[in-house]
């Protein structure tokens, strides 16, 4: 079985090693992740593609810094327009245009593993953007929606694992980078063992 793990940064990958798993640094953000995910699928098409990184947690979510979550859904949160009523997601705008109105993307493979808390993610180009409705999500990151979209379009089996590094609030500077990277690494080894790696 071939498995590739994408990490947005070398920092997030720094503690991970596995003799039967390929690792790739995708780069931070939606654009870099879409490119690297597409490239990996086109050139290698592994049996599983996993995105692993840190994430911020919203105060209303039932997760704490240092916990690990399997991401069940993703939303590209800042895709839309500012209207007189405020920010409106592109999927909810009454535009007379013919295009795919995608909002929330779901991972159909989360049942392949067990023992992980499931989280709803939002991907943002601008972290902690104040105009985003976060009531229906738990965590934020900068890559997940692009990863989900490419994998779904290409019929690629995929999972996303995130370790909570901080509370996603402006001015909340109490990050646990070292602890979250360790938690991510430990969680990734548990996940890979369940996949048979």
Describe the role of every protein-language-model region.
Residues 6-10:
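Structural motif
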């Amino acid at each position: 079985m071939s498995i590739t793990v994408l990490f947005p940064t070398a920092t997030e990958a720094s503690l991970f090693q596995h003799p039967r798993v390929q690792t790739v640094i995708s780069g931070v953000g939606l654009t870099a992740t879409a490119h690297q995910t597409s490239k990996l699928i086109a050139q290698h098409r592994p049996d599983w593609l996993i995105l692993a990184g840190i994430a911020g947690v919203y105060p209303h979510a039932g997760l704490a810094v240092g916990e690990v979550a399997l991401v069940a859904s993703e939303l590209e949160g800042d895709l839309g327009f500012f209207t007189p009523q405020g920010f409106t997601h592109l999927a909810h705008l009454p535009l007379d245009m013919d295009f795919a109105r995608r909002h929330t993307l779901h991972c159909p493979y989360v049942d392949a593993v067990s023992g992980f808390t499931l989280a709803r993610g939002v991907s943002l180009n601008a972290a902690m953007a104040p105009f985003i409705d976060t009531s229906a999500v738990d965590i934020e990151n900068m890559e997940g929606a692009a990863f989900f979209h490419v994998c779904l379009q290409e019929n690629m089996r995929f999972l996303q694992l995130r370790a909570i590094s901080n509370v996603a609030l402006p001015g909340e500077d109490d990050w646990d980078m070292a602890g979250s990277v360790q938690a991510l690494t430990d969680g990734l080894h548990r996940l890979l063992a369940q996949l048979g790696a």
